[in-house]
Amino acid sequence: MSRIGRKPIEVPAGVTVNVDSNNLVTVKGPKGTLSESIRPEVTVNINGATVEITRVNDSRQARAFHGLSRTLVANMVDGVTKGFEKTLEMNGTGYRATLDGKTLVLSLGFSHPVRVEPYEGNSFEVAERRVVIKGPNKQKVGDQAANIRKLRPPEPYLGKGIKYSDEVIRRKAGKAGKK
């Protein structure tokens, strides 16, 4: 049995979890509402303040989706209570970020500023060279952070570019030069 899948999910006060007949799990909380369709190989049982995920059978697919489904539901519960965030840092001369309403405007050395609209439910916080992406959906927060990082990935010689705050860039030595 999946070690992750068999752990029950604690549902905090102020959060409601509903499952309909099509295995669509809906979680409502103070930071919003999230829905996820769960595979038919697993079932979702709500027992008071806990949610348990069980397998229908012991097939290879059911075992594979058991832990995944439990993690997806647990992330939804965490998202509507605490939310998720990713922090990006910009290194480079003239690299800057500003907010224009809800839109993120990035100056990344191109001939034009790059405008990034937030995904549904996400929001941006900006310091001079730091961008924080916040939202209840872990997948959307991570996806938006990856797409922003992709605009100017960090390069190994000078370290210029956009990187995650906890990412370590492996630096390379420059040319050896003539002697």
UniProtKB/Swiss-Prot annotation:
GO terms for molecular function: rRNA binding; structural constituent of ribosome. GO terms for biological process: cytoplasmic translation. InterPro entries: Ribosomal_uL6-like (IPR000702), Ribosomal_uL6-like_a/b-dom_sf (IPR036789), Ribosomal_uL6_a/b-dom (IPR020040), Ribosomal_uL6_bac-type (IPR019906). Keywords: Ribonucleoprotein, Ribosomal protein, RNA-binding, rRNA-binding. HAMAP family: Ribosomal_uL6_B. NCBIfam families: L6_bact. PANTHER family: 60S/50S RIBOSOMAL PROTEIN L6/L9 (PTHR11655), LARGE RIBOSOMAL SUBUNIT PROTEIN UL6M (PTHR11655:SF14). Part of the 50S ribosomal subunit. This is Large ribosomal subunit protein uL6.
